[in-house]
Amino acid sequence: MAFQRRRNNYYNRLRRLLPFICAVSGALLILFALLSILSPPPDDSDRRISKHINYGANDEKKNTPVVFTVPRGGGRSDRDIWRSWNAEFFYGCCNASSKFPNAKAITRNDRYLAIATSGGLNQQRTGIVDAVVAARILNATLVIPKLDQKSYWKDASDFSNIFDVDWFMSFLSKDVKIIEKLPQKGGQTWSPRRMRVPRKCNEKCYINRVLPVLQKRHAVQLNKFDYRLSNKLRDDLQKLRCRVNYHALKFTDPILEMGNELVRRMRKRSKHFIALHLRFEPDMLAFSGCYYGGGEKEKKELGTIRRRWKTLHVNNPEKQRRQGRCPLTPEEVGLMLRALGYGSDVHIYVASGEVYGGEKSLAPLKALFPHFYSKDTIATKMELKPFSSYSSRMAALDFLVCDESDVFVTNNNGNMARILAGRRRYFGHKPTIRPNAKKLYKLFMSKENTTWEEFASRVRTFQKGFMGEPKEVRAGKGEFHENPAACICEDTDAKVKAGKMDSRKFGKKEQKEDEDAELSSSETDYEEDQTDLQDRGLYNGTRLDYDDALSVSEEPELEEMLSD
């Protein structure tokens, strides 16, 4: 009986507390609901366009709630923003030495090498350059390379539609014998033995793998020929690479004339101009696995594109960005340039495909640099008609304008960026800016909590070693097409006369630096960045190696789409 009374008392107390518990719970639910409504979503703001930034506002607008005010002018700079430091003391040098025999003396009449290139215009260019060297290694006659007409780009152009064939053959006549097509055998066109060599195949590799087949079959075609030659070759072969890339490969007259006209129109608008290879296309962003704060719409759009590539695993977007693997947004590129000293009066030529987000993404960049052009805005549709149906010819026009620009800015390290970087080093070290994305990441994320002066100072510090200046990268480091150190000489006599001789001792003009010299911090940053790209298999703009047959069959478009 006593037990029953105690149990009744317990339930009575519980019933009296129940309304109070319900009231407290209800109040908490209402509080949480209010907080969820009033609080912004965590880290889901659109990074393509920053809030609370005033682009070039006057100091009078003191009531505007702006934390980060970007000046209209570039400010005072401690450097000439239109030329590289000490560039006048370096020059391209790729003449053959007296020990490099003439092609007639070493070419075997029963050896023919053909190649089939791969990818977009600039990836194919690397294949053409290396094919000449491969033919020289094998003492073979080179057949004019076949351009890729079946990949993602679906460009029906052949070699003669892009490059001047006669000039190519005549300029290299002392180095390699070149013919337009294989000779006939028994009244029929010679059918070559098709094969493929590994990536980065060196001289010994070609002798061991290709030469025995060539000696037996006399005609060999190397397929998917891109980056199939080692970065490290003896100097006379490296100089041959440079003769091909910087002198023998000349665009056809129609391309040159239109490209030069585009440059003339840019020069008519301004004495100096910047060319920007933006690379903010949907395909590029989808492949990178990066996220720019566009919410579910962005995730769905880029996710749909990304699913085309079955071999890509799911990335951590924040980790990708921290490690410098994400292209800068158009706004971030603009802020970097302003911090480096380029004011709103600077004219910019943009080489880009479809920009993700369209005008919304481009708006901050255009606000920073209103003098904003592309080939479509400075040329008529009628003028571009002979080129517009061919992706390689359109890319060639952009290539020419970017090459002739006073400053070239690249937002990724694809083939076009690397080839132009090497070419601009060879022809006078014209400024070539590549964002140090790994270091800039945190700075961009916290920019609205700092002053412009502090932001600009840190950008300038982080970009040391990424500006295309002489000796920025140690000889032999990185991709040869980007850093053709064997083909760049130093005029030490002129440097001594100018009173700018380095404290280190220099020997002859072509003497290499001591390999054990201590790296500067900026060079270390650069080399870490290149090593990271190589480790991820992205050094030539892709995760896939064509040596993997399974990858080829599953991902036929991946490399071509992202290569340039």
From Swiss-Prot:
Substrate binds at H277, L278, R279. Glycans are attached at N95, N139, N449, N540. The chain crosses the membrane at residues 17-37. Residues 513-532 have a biased composition (Acidic residues). Pathway: Glycan metabolism. It is a single-pass type II membrane protein. It is found in: Membrane. Residues 501-542 are annotated as: Disordered. Pfam families: O-FucT. Its EC number is 2.4.1.-. InterPro entries: FucosylTrfase_pln, GDP-Fuc_O-FucTrfase. GO terms for biological process: fucose metabolic process. The keyword Coiled coil does not apply. This is O-fucosyltransferase 6. It comes from Arabidopsis thaliana (Mouse-ear cress).
